[in-house]
Amino acid sequence: MEDVNAYMEIIKENIEYEHHMKYGRWQDKGLYEELYEVICEIVCVKHKTVKIGGNDYPYELVKSKFLKLNSSHLEYVIGCMQETTTKIANIKAYMVTALYNAPSTMNHYYQQEVQHDMYGGGI
């Protein structure tokens, strides 16, 4: 149980949980809380593998990536989910996949947004 509490505190610090609960947009607080809970569950409940986008990944790899998530990654996931108009059948699996992929896709996403706004008729 000590490890679980330690991991939960590390995650809270990494994602600036207290700051977002105190100063974040009220409509995003519930979403932030849910993402925090999903991260904690993935990190604290040991499995042989974790299913990400239909594929099984080694637990230790997923745990390592989830322990590196920060507030920017969560804000990116929340933003992407708010823009999604497609019906999501398994919201938890979608959240896990989005969190796992956030560090690998976030910078390219924002770069593409800038390119579109500057040169693609977005302005």
Question: What are the functions of these language-model segments?
Answer:
Residues 1-123:
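Electrostatic interaction modules used in gene-expression and signaling proteins
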